[in-house]
Amino acid sequence: MKKKLLALICALALVFSLVRCTISAPDTVGSIGDFEITSGMYLLAQYGAYQQAAQLAGTDQDTTDVKAFLKETITTDSDSGETAVVSDYVAQKTQETLETLAAVDARFKALGGELTAEQLSTADRYAQQMMDQYGDTYTANGIGLETVKAYERLQVEHTALLDMVYGPDGETPVEDDELTSHLDDSMYEICYISIPLYNTSTYAFADDDQKAEMLKLAQAAADSVNAAGGETVSDQVSALHEAAQNALPDIYAVLDSETSDDSASVQTELLTESDVASAFTQDGAADALRSLSYGEAAAVQINGSTLLLMVRVDPLSVSSLDDLRSQILSDMKGGELDDALAAGGAELAHDLDSSAMNKLPAKKIVNNSANS
């Protein structure tokens, strides 16, 4: 009899344990507009908000101690000095993310959008890649593959909205001449060779005198590119490659370093103003790039560890306007679209279940990446 009673107590304990697990993980936390927010999507938004807060943490704040960090204060605007308690910041950013996702879904559907099989496959494939890479972290935070798939599909919808709103057949199309003007004035296509300002074997960094010598030699190479006067992008890239092959051995020798087989390989990239601001951090580097005309070469130290030997080229000599349209629209109108989506999401009817959200508190976030 005692054994049966014990078995019954154990069974009841298991049932109550399972009930508690079910209660602590609701299927949804409500909706914003017609967008139903699953618990997984809520947790993903909350985890992302926590990571945003972690990026703003001070060097003396430990973001792996989630409960403690949530009680601390971070500076949210370095210019104004505005601060926020982390828990409040995370709650605010979580809601803003969910509002934006709801607005993306609503706007996409309102414009008659429907993802193609290829778009769905691309989103799902990327979601699987994310799970393969970050699966342990996602799982620890209650985020599964289906949630990541749903999120990535919304990202595809968001990208598609740029064309649906601003494309040739969009609601408010941006004319080709506007795109071309933005491309000329605010984007920079460069063909470049990256030169490390350190010995590639010992990783000993160049001192100021060595950097000056390397820059002088690289600029002489750039001058030879300009003297060649190449009229086409192909001519300009060929001249750049030849100049690099001739100059790099002497440049590397400043640090007793040697070139490799691909040291003179030319790379091409179309940069936005945001890219320039984040990558060209050395004093005067960004302005040096902006001042270049199409076909003009220069040597520019872009940060403490990298020197570029580069030539600015006409993007429309490399790609057609149609090929560049989405990239230009993203740079030109991406911020405007995001602002509109954020405002639209905030205006949608909010039917959120506070009791459900309270069962998914930020204090349960697992964050093993210490703030650097």
State each model region's role.
Residues 220-282, 323:
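Peptidyl-prolyl cis-trans isomerase
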Residues 23-143:
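N-terminal targeting/tethering segments
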Residues 23-25, 32, 138-216, 275-372:
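PPIase-associated folding chaperone regions across multiple families
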Residues 16-20:
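C-terminal motif of bacterial Sec signal peptides marking the signal peptidase cleavage site
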